[in-house]
Swiss-Prot record:
Subcellular location: Cell inner membrane
Gene behind this protein: kdpF
UniProt keyword terms in alphabetical order: Cell inner membrane, Cell membrane, Ion transport, Membrane, Potassium, Potassium transport, Transmembrane, Transmembrane helix, Transport
GO MF terms held by the record: P-type potassium transmembrane transporter activity
Name of the molecule in the record: Potassium-transporting ATPase KdpF subunit
Keyword Cytoplasm set for record: no
GO terms for biological process, alphabetical: monoatomic cation transmembrane transport; potassium ion transmembrane transport; potassium ion transport
């Protein structure tokens, strides 16, 4: 795997994690 592919996968996981985190915070409020 190239560095670009690894970077892209990491960015996707970061975005998904951020969305889930935002949804949980919205539910808390």
């Amino acid at each position: 795997m190239s560095a670009g592919v690894i970077t892209g996968v990491l960015l996707v996981f970061l975005l998904l994690g951020y969305l889930v985190y935002a949804l949980i915070n919205a539910e808390a409020f």
